[in-house]
Amino acid sequence: MTKISKIIDELNNQQADAAWITTPLNVYYFTGYRSEPHERLFALLIKKDGKQVLFCPKMEVEEVKASPFTGEIVGYLDTENPFSLYPQTINKLLIESEHLTVARQKQLISGFNVNSFGDVDLTIKQLRNIKSEDEINKIRKAAELADKCIEIGVSYLKESVTEREVVNHIEQTIKQYGVNEMSFDTMVLFGDHAASPHGTPGDRRLKSNEYVLFDLGVIYEHYCSDMTRTIKFGEPSQEAQEIYNIVLEAETSAIQAIKPGIPLKDIDHIARNIISEKGYGEYFPHRLGHGLGLQEHEYQDVSSTNSNLLEAGMVITIEPGIYVPGVAGVRIEDDILVTNEGYEVLTHYEK
C-alpha cells in the first residue's frame, strides 16, 4: 500500500475530505521536494480522490517541477493570498495538530471554509516508522559517515585540546567526505563534564586518564544517524571504568534482544535492570532510545512505558548511560535496524 493510499484510508476512517500537511520534512516524505519556507506557506493538500496539490512560493515552482512530485502546483507571490488561487470548500480537514499554528488554522477556516478538523499526525508517524529499502540505505550511509566522524575526533585527541576544538575539527574534516549538515549539534565532553547528559562543549581542556564522550550524527540525503561513543584517553579511574563496563553490558544485552514482536518497553527494561542491579539506577535518567529517520529523534521511543511492538523496517537507537556528577558520564549509542530475523547494527566504531 502506498503512502498516499494510507492517508486516503485515514480520510475514510475519519470521514474527512482532505489532509493538509505542512511540516517540511513530512511534505518531503510524500513529495520528494524539500523546502524551508520560513514564514511563507508551504503545504501539501491530499484529497480523498487521491489528488495532490502542493502550495509553495512562486519562486520555487520550477524546482518543484524538477522534483519527483507529479501533482498540481499552486505557486503564489508574496503579495497574493494562496487560498484565493485554489478556492475549495472542505467540510472536514485532517491536519498535523502538533505542527499547525492557530493563525494558520484560522486561515484554513476562512480559506477553505473548513467546518471541522481531525488529526493526521499519528498516521504519518506510523508510515515514517517503517522504512523502505531506499530509506534504510540512506540511513546506513549516514551511520557509516558517523563512524568516520568518531574516527576523526578520536585521532585529534591530545592533552590540552578543548572540547570545542575537537567539535570544530570533526565538523570541518567530515565535509571532505561530502557531508553538508550534521543531524544535531555535535557533542564532545571531557571527564566528569559528560555527567551532564546534554552538556554543551566548551573550553575545558583534555587531561590524561579521563573519558571523552562523543555524541553526533550526520545527515545523508535528508536521513540522519545518531551515535555515541565514550573513549578512554589514558587510564580513567577504576569507578569510571566500572561504569563504562556496566553501560556496555546494558547496551549489548538490549540490542541482542531486538526482534519483531517484542514490546519496546521490554528492551528498555533489559538495559535498565542491568544498570539498576549494579547500583546505578538513579544515574540513568532517560529512556533507552528513540526512532531515527528524517529526524534524529522520531516515533517511536524505546521507553519503559511504550507497549508497542518492534516491527521489521524500524530503525531505532539504543543508548543507555550512567551519569555520576564529579566522577564520569558514560553513554554508548548505536543505530539499529529491526530485520525480519532480528536486528542489524548500522554503526560500527569499536566500543
Swiss-Prot record:
Enzyme's top EC category: hydrolase
Binding site for Mn(2+) 1: D226, H290, E319, E333
One Pfam family in the UniProt entry: Peptidase_M24
Residues noted as binding Mn(2+) 2 in the record, renumbered to the chain: D215, D226, E333
A single GO molecular function term of this UniProt record: hydrolase activity
Obligatory cofactor(s): Mn(2+)
UniProt remark on cofactor binding: Binds 2 manganese ions per subunit.
Enzyme nomenclature, EC number: 3.4.-.-
SUPFAM superfamilies in the cross-refs: Creatinase/aminopeptidase, Creatinase/prolidase N-terminal domain
Keywords: Hydrolase, Manganese, Metal-binding
Keyword Ribonucleoprotein in record: no
Family: Belongs to the peptidase M24B family.
PANTHER family hit by this protein: AMINOPEPTIDASE, DIPEPTIDASE YKVY-RELATED
Protein name per its UniProtKB record: Uncharacterized peptidase SAR1786
Organism: Staphylococcus aureus (strain MRSA252)
Source lineage: Bacteria, Bacillati, Bacillota, Bacilli, Bacillales
